[in-house]
Each structure stands twice: as C-alpha cells, then as structure tokens.
C-alpha cells in the first residue's frame, strides 16, 4: 500500500473537491459528524469528493475536550447518533470506520476510566442503532497515549494521532509508526482562488484507515 496524502477541515469541500485532487494531489479528506450541521459532512459533499477520486474519513467530535465529558451513557448516545448520520444521511459503507475524538491530553487514569467507558458505550450505541449488526469500525483520534491505550484495550480498531506533539506518548507513537492516520500542523493552501486553512494528514503506508467512498 502507498502512503496517502490527506487533509482535515471543518469547511465544506464540495466546490473544492476536483481542485484538491487535481491540483494538490490529495487522496482523502477527513470530515465531521456532530450535532453542529455547519461543520458536518453532507451527502452532496461526500458524493463530490468520491466523484473527484478522493476517499473520505469521518470523526465524531462534539465536546470531548475534558474528562467529565466521557461517560458510558455519553458514548452510547454518541455511537447511536454517529450511526444515524453514517447510515441514514451519508450511506457510509459497512466495514469503514468512524473515529471518535479524545481532544485533550488525557491522563492514563482518564483513559483507563471514563474514556474507556465512553468507548465501550460507543460500541453499544453503534450495535443497538444497527439492530445488533456491527456495521462500522471504531477509531480514536487523540494523543499517542490515548491511541495506544484504547487500541490495547480493544475498544478502538484504528488510531488517528493528533498534531499535538506535546501530548503524552505522541512523539513515541509517531516514531514507531503505530498510527493508521497522522495529523500535522495547519497550513494554508490556495484552491479555486481562495486560501483555505487545513490540517494535513497522512495514512500509514502499510495499513488501511477505514476510509470510504459513496
């Protein structure tokens, strides 16, 4: 497998899809599922990206920036909501991944306790919403420590290492190439006469990352 070049952004990319592929050589775009429609991946956008030859990845992210957010019940709710967006809005293919964000420098105690409970809830929510069918795989976005811990505990199949190199375990995780996706510091790119601020990303050269097309 080749190492793929991608980006993530809160911006809708429908009008930029062809140029992102043809002019900048992006292979994939990572977009959002959430309760905020303004930043969410839309069906039209997913179709435009796919038609341009790009793959898509998605992350569920709302308020996962502090320990108190992460509970079993919150995981169930988020897993269920993410399933509905993936299945009913986008038509995301089975077997692909939905990443869930741990967007802070979580301690080992946080990861062993509330964050792991949250991811257990995510699985339960996805399972229940899917009528007892494990339709989507679960990924984690976060620090190296978060990625390593949640994969070792079996509650995340994929890991997306955040750009925050000062977070616990992140530099070691990057050096060991343990990630499926890695995020880099923001950069500005010119597309269709506009300057967009995006986060560059890349896949691991030898592993899939749960990306998809529609």
Regions found by a protein language model. Name each.
Residues 106-130:
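Active-site cleft segment of glycoside hydrolase catalytic domains centered on the general acid/base Glu
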Residues 2-10, 18, 23, 147-214:
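Functionally critical loop-and-helix segments that line ligand-binding/catalytic clefts
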Residues 2-12, 31-112:
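Substrate-binding cleft of extracellular glycoside hydrolase catalytic domains
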Residues 16-21, 43-47, 119-123:
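Short amphipathic alpha-helical segments and helix-helix/interface helices
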